[in-house]
Amino acid sequence: MNPLDLIAKRAYPYETEKRDKTYLALNENPFPFPEDLVDEVFRRLNSDALRIYYDSPDEELIEKILSYLDTDFLSKNNVSVGNGADEIIYVMMLMFDRSVFFPPTYSCYRIFAKAVGAKFLEVPLTKDLRIPEVNVGEGDVVFIPNPNNPTGHVFEREEIERILKTGAFVALDEAYYEFHGESYVDFLKKYENLAVIRTFSKAFSLAAQRVGYVVASEKFIDAYNRVRLPFNVSYVSQMFAKVALDHREIFEERTKFIVEERERMKSALREMGYRITDSRGNFVFVFMEKEEKERLLEHLRTKNVAVRSFREGVRITIGKREENDMILRELEVFK
């Protein structure tokens, strides 16, 4: 078979809808990156640095990430960066023999595994959304988003540690950490078969800049840096990340608002009679049967609103207050 035909058969592109609507589908931050911080980024840029292949990761960025992590057991050799958390995930699929994940989960795990031709195993979460018993070991990388995406619920420490004890490598995807506030990065004191992945896309309003980072053992970081592309995160993107960390209090205040809105929406949806998860992300998840879900999606299309559809239901990003009020009104009308 022609290699291009093979790729077309096994892989598929990540597609999004047009942005000519109220868009609550991709868990983007509803607040723009502050204009004064954009100005600061451009004041701090060195025009001469634009002509060179700039260091990635930038040592200054690594130091700021370490400060943000606020631990006493990590050093600069425990951190690297990626062109978004997605690149880190993609590269890890090249590093291990088999990728394992538990749907409903982040859809790109499957997309990336098929794109790179990786062996992968999908084992659904249990009915109560817990990690199932699974036969894994050395050579496997197990991807676990925590809080989970798309459901937003949190896995218990015991569930994560059960997988760590098998010897399989665990990629703990903490993309939504800031909206939950609890991390399992301390497992790195005990386990070398763990990498914690985070992103600047969600809480820091920098999805377009594509900056993620990974925290792991020195041995893993050394291997990752050998496999990833050189100069993988641009000078400008790294500067945006550094400025964001220098002004983290702005983003912490915004995150507080998003969390308050999430809890308000969860309370309202429960009162309406919807079955939802206890989401700890910047979104809510509503369980629905296929027929009801399709009717809701059509109803929202007539109102020019986009949410994300999954087999188990719909995921709704927390937006600005007026957007959240609007979606609640439409869900009440639909009910």
From Swiss-Prot:
<feature type="modified residue" description="N6-(pyridoxal phosphate)lysine">
    <location>
        <position position="202"/>
    </location>
</feature>
<dbReference type="InterPro" id="IPR050106">
    <property type="entry name" value="HistidinolP_aminotransfase"/>
</dbReference>
<keyword id="KW-0368">Histidine biosynthesis</keyword>
<comment type="similarity">
    <text>Belongs to the class-II pyridoxal-phosphate-dependent aminotransferase family. Histidinol-phosphate aminotransferase subfamily.</text>
</comment>
<protein>
    <recommendedName>
        <fullName>Histidinol-phosphate aminotransferase</fullName>
        <ecNumber>2.6.1.9</ecNumber>
    </recommendedName>
</protein>
<dbReference type="InterPro" id="IPR015421">
    <property type="entry name" value="PyrdxlP-dep_Trfase_major"/>
</dbReference>
<dbReference type="GO" id="GO:0030170">
    <property type="term" value="F:pyridoxal phosphate binding"/>
</dbReference>
<dbReference type="GO" id="GO:0000105">
    <property type="term" value="P:L-histidine biosynthetic process"/>
</dbReference>
<comment type="pathway">
    <text>Amino-acid biosynthesis; L-histidine biosynthesis; L-histidine from 5-phospho-alpha-D-ribose 1-diphosphate: step 7/9.</text>
</comment>
<dbReference type="Pfam" id="PF00155">
    <property type="entry name" value="Aminotran_1_2"/>
</dbReference>
<keyword id="KW-0808">Transferase</keyword>
<keyword id="KW-0028">Amino-acid biosynthesis</keyword>
<dbReference type="InterPro" id="IPR015424">
    <property type="entry name" value="PyrdxlP-dep_Trfase"/>
</dbReference>
<dbReference type="InterPro" id="IPR005861">
    <property type="entry name" value="HisP_aminotrans"/>
</dbReference>
<keyword id="KW-0032">Aminotransferase</keyword>
<dbReference type="InterPro" id="IPR004839">
    <property type="entry name" value="Aminotransferase_I/II_large"/>
</dbReference>
<keyword id="KW-0663">Pyridoxal phosphate</keyword>
<dbReference type="InterPro" id="IPR015422">
    <property type="entry name" value="PyrdxlP-dep_Trfase_small"/>
</dbReference>
<dbReference type="GO" id="GO:0042803">
    <property type="term" value="F:protein homodimerization activity"/>
</dbReference>
<dbReference type="GO" id="GO:0004400">
    <property type="term" value="F:histidinol-phosphate transaminase activity"/>
</dbReference>
<dbReference type="InterPro" id="IPR001917">
    <property type="entry name" value="Aminotrans_II_pyridoxalP_BS"/>
</dbReference>
<comment type="subunit">
    <text>Homodimer.</text>
</comment>
